Amino acid sequence: MRFAWLASVLLVVGGILDAATPPRSKKQFINPNGVPKPTGYTQVVTSGPGQMIFLSGQGGAAPDGTMPEDFATQARNTFENIGRCLAVANARFEDIVKINYYVTDMAYTAELRRIRAQYLNQAAPPASTLVQTALGQGLRLEVEVIAIVPE
């Protein structure tokens, strides 16, 4: 009888403690089609409530993985890759709340702004531009993005 009473108390207390624990945010890790497959990381992670989307650094590789030599083509490919990554999380460019640019030469920033304006045509989100002398082989630009999609 004592055992049954103790077991009942433990079940009730366990249920109360379990009910008081807030649910963990739901995370989903995604590697979208049309974006080069990564090794050792994921291209996109989403998290809720109010879906937060974190993109790994996107570069200028074409969907087949080839790397163009010129900066303008790399920049366009980079923003196309960002668009594909956002789309798998039901997000768009206007959902971006933070963006970080890594370039191998500050001389590229004028061209970057011109191409960026074709994709980010709303109020510009907070951004950082950093010179990074050692990106991946042949890479002249890498862009990290955080976006939020309301529930």
Predicted regions and their residues:
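N-terminal presequence-like segments and the immediate start of the first folded domain
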Residues: F3-E80, R84-V97, V103-E151
